[in-house]
């Protein structure tokens, strides 16, 4: 889940504006698309508000959109036109850093890998299962078919939480 140089640059510019709106920055997606790019910002309630079961509201999204628009006008880090979207990460949230996954140990995650894992005809570049543990270099996953994997964090291209209605 290595962030591109552009996403890192945008994060450094945008993070203070998001914090000024009293919400937490979960992550940023940037997709250059010809003459018009897409910048998607995910925000969530601050930890102390999450403890009180407070969620991100449409008003939070609008405030961040307004604040970030102003910052981007000043810094102009995106060439050409762009679409700015602000939302919560949702139930099936993407993970933007390894650290974000720690809070979801015991839950189901979906991984897209850089290099395949497994043996023979059971090799796979995608794995879905229970996140058993995570440390500084790897995670342990029990796949939905029961197979156990230890996966290097450096081998993860994309990771998402899989929402399961309790």
Swiss-Prot record:
InterPro entries: Ribosome_maturation_RimP (IPR003728), RimP_C (IPR028998), RimP_C_sf (IPR036847), RimP_N (IPR028989), RimP_N_sf (IPR035956). One of its GO terms (cellular component) is cytosol. It comes from the Bacteria. It comes from Psychrobacter cryohalolentis (strain ATCC BAA-1226 / DSM 17306 / VKM B-2378 / K5). GO terms for biological process: ribosomal small subunit assembly; translation. Keywords: Cytoplasm, Ribosome biogenesis. The keyword Cytoplasm applies. It is found in: Cytoplasm. Transmembrane segments: none annotated. Required for maturation of 30S ribosomal subunits. This is Ribosome maturation factor RimP. The lineage of its organism: Bacteria, Pseudomonadati, Pseudomonadota, Gammaproteobacteria, Moraxellales. It holds the Pfam family DUF150_C. The keyword Heme does not apply. The gene is rimP. Belongs to the RimP family.
């Amino acid at each position: 889940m290595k962030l591109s140089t552009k996403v890192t640059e945008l994060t450094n510019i945008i993070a203070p504006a998001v914090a000024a709106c009293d919400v937490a920055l979960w992550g940023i997606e940037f997709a250059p698309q010809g003459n018009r790019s897409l910048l998607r910002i995910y925000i969530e309630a601050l930890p102390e508000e999450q403890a009180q079961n407070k969620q991100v509201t449409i008003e939070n999204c609008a405030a961040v959109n307004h604040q970030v628009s102003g910052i981007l006008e000043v810094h102009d880090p995106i060439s050409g036109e762009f679409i700015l979207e602000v939302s919560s990460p949702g139930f099936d949230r993407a993970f933007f850093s390894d650290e974000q996954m720690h809070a979801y140990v015991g839950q189901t995650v979906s991984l897209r890998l850089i290099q395949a894992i497994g043996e023979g005809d059971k090799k796979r570049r995608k794995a879905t299962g229970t996140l058993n543990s995570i440390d500084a270099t790897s995670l342990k996953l029990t796949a939905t078919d029961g197979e156990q994997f230890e996966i290097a964090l450096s081998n993860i291209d994309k990771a998402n939480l899989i929402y399961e209605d309790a």
